[in-house]
Design a protein with these regions (language model features):
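N-terminal beta1-alpha1-beta2 submodule of the flavodoxin-like/Rossmannoid cofactor-binding fold
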Residues: 1-117
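Short, glycine-/small-residue-rich phosphate/pyrophosphate-handling segment
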Residues: 115-141
Length: 141
């Protein structure tokens, strides 16, 4: 099994993110001892969000079902889409995830949505996903 773990937030790989990795990795290893885990930090890559070129929507086109924009995450998007699981760790800023993580998710997920009378997905597989977040709030809030 290959599992990708993403972390977004501050550029520095701080103690909160290190604790996230330890917590998530221990949980994965408890369930799947031989899991291959690839960690990545979104700020280690130079990329932008979707640019609305619609290359991913052109049926029978070379980019149909995948992002056609070429940059640092082009190959990574393919790898992540074939993973057997994904764990995303992120702080919450201004009631949402950081923009860099949002951009990655746009580029990863939007190509799989097909427009028609009904929306459906052409994703290569269903992927178990976990999202671990932190925010500056108490449990009561």
């Amino acid at each position: 099994m290959t599992c990708f773990m993403h972390s977004a937030g501050v550029r520095e790989k701080n103690i909160i993110q290190i604790n996230f990795w330890i917590f998530a990795l221990n949980g994965i290893r408890d369930i799947i001892p031989d899991a291959k885990v690839k960690k990545l930090y979104v700020y280690d890559y130079n990329y932008t969000g979707c640019i609305s070129c619609y290359a991913c929507k052109r049926m029978n086109g070379k980019s149909c079902g995948k992002c056609g924009k070429k940059d640092d995450i082009s190959g990574l998007l393919f790898e992540v889409s074939r993973a057997e699981g994904i764990v995303i760790g992120s702080p919450v800023y201004f009631h949402d995830i950081p923009g860099q993580l949002r951009s990655l998710m746009e580029r990863l997920l939007y190509p799989y949505l097909v427009y028609g009378k009904e929306y459906y997905s052409i994703a290569p597989c269903k992927m178990p996903t976990a999202f671990i977040y932190t925010m500056n709030a108490t449990e009561e809030k």
